[in-house]
């Protein structure tokens, strides 16, 4: 596994440590995040949690696509994978402790999902954001859509998901994907974490709880319809073509079936 969990004073750090692959998140890393969060949640000395990627090239380029054939190659395996992903994201969002994403370089796909599950997001000018699901024929999960909608709204979510393009740091700031773009990201984030650690934990938890309750959807989405759409995409020839094209380093030829 290439996930590091570190404790520095009152801050618990979770580090994606696979710089040769732009900190892509493999299966072992996904499975390690929720237990790491539980460990930090239980530690009374830890007041906040921070996520970062090793090096400066990437926070995380997303899920390790080299594993897609084995971990997401069928409708059933996609469902299992999405269940694991939901568990990971809820472990971050539902933590009683505030979380911060410190973003350098690429923050794509699953990496962006993790950042969106954090309470606060700060990035360097080098940061690039995006969700390339449409370029891979991939069915993006329900929780990922929900968090993106809550963060940037319906119009921006449509553009991000339909086009699959990348956005620079200033564009991400303008649409609300990040809270600030800062020149000295590490020292700025360290100061934010120091401020969080010094503030009253129960006061932060109170606000976190109230905010989460208010952003919950007041409607009743048709979950069966959403899951059917995911399954249809996961079983499609286009999804197989997207995976093959990525591994063969060519443009995919999607047929809509």
What label would you give each PLM region?
Residues 1-52, 90:
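Conserved CoA-thioester-binding segment of acyl-CoA-metabolizing enzymes
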Residues 45, 53-91, 137, 218:
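Glycine- (often His-adjacent) and acidic-residue-rich active-site loop
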Residues 244-257:
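Terminal low-complexity tails and localization/encapsulation signals of metabolic enzymes
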